[in-house]
């Protein structure tokens, strides 16, 4: 079980996070298996939601990386026909281009963060190829799959939310700095063989491991 103190929210933060800093309307989802154009923040390639609606998001895909953090109650996400039953505190990273759908709690209750962001700004960094390979399939991060790094990873994402809803003039830069910390931490442990096989999507097979070995050679 994930320690709840790492991701619990005060009522004041809930109230703050319900409102997008720059967007009046809610998230728009495309038709089943259609491309979704993420409504990014102006002059940025990211968007964060504090989501408490029981809506079901039909099968779709986009060029952005999607990260889902369950905060209260369960949340079911299907990525490329693999089903993930997220528990409070679980982090699921969905890679760009992956078909996925989201099913809310059947009782209509639940809270979660949904992050959408593009990482192409890091592609010019030679070492970033290791990150792309480590996250080429869906990745589940929690206290069971990644006990050595879970506290760091969930703390970084909660910091992302605080910065996103702050009035910092450099908040986008701060968020990308935090995201880079998140991906570096996981990738370092992945390359060192410290990540549980349960963290990686079952779609990750020997071909994926071979790709990593090729990068390291």
Describe each model-derived feature in a short phrase.
Residues 150-153, 176, 196-217:
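A short, Lys/Arg-enriched amphipathic alpha-helix from helix-turn-helix/homeodomain DNA-binding modules
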Residues 81-96:
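Short acidic-glycine-tyrosine-enriched beta hairpin
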Residues 4-5, 130-181, 185:
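Amphipathic alpha-helical segments enriched in hydrophobic/aromatic residues interleaved with Lys/Arg
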Residues 97-126:
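Ligand-binding loop in jelly-roll beta-barrel domains
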Residues 180-201:
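Linker/hinge segments immediately adjacent to helix-turn-helix/homeobox DNA-binding domains
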Residues 1-78, 82-84:
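Generic protein-terminus/edge-of-domain signal
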């Amino acid at each position: 079980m994930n320690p709840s103190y790492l991701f619990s929210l005060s009522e004041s933060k809930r109230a703050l996070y319900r409102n997008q800093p720059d967007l009046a309307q809610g998230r728009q989802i495309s038709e089943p298996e259609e491309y979704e154009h993420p409504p990014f923040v102006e002059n940025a390639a990211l968007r964060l939601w504090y989501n408490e609606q029981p809506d079901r998001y039909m099968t779709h895909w986009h060029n952005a990386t999607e990260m889902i953090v369950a905060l209260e109650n369960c949340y079911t996400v299907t990525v490329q026909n693999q089903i993930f039953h997220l528990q409070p505190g679980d982090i699921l990273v969905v890679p760009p281009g992956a078909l996925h759908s989201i099913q809310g709690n059947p009782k209509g209750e639940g809270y979660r963060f949904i992050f959408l962001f593009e990482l192409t700004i890091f592609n010019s960094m030679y070492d970033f190829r290791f990150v792309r390979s480590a996250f080429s399939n869906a990745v589940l991060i929690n206290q069971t799959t990644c006990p050595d790094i879970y506290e760091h990873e969930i703390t970084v994402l909660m910091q992302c939310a605080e910065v996103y809803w702050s009035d910092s003039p450099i908040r986008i830069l701060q968020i990308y700095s935090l995201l880079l910390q998140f991906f570096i931490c996981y990738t370092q442990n992945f390359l060192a063989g410290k990540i549980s096989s349960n963290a990686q999507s079952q779609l990750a097979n020997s071909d994926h491991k071979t790709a990593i070995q090729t990068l390291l050679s």
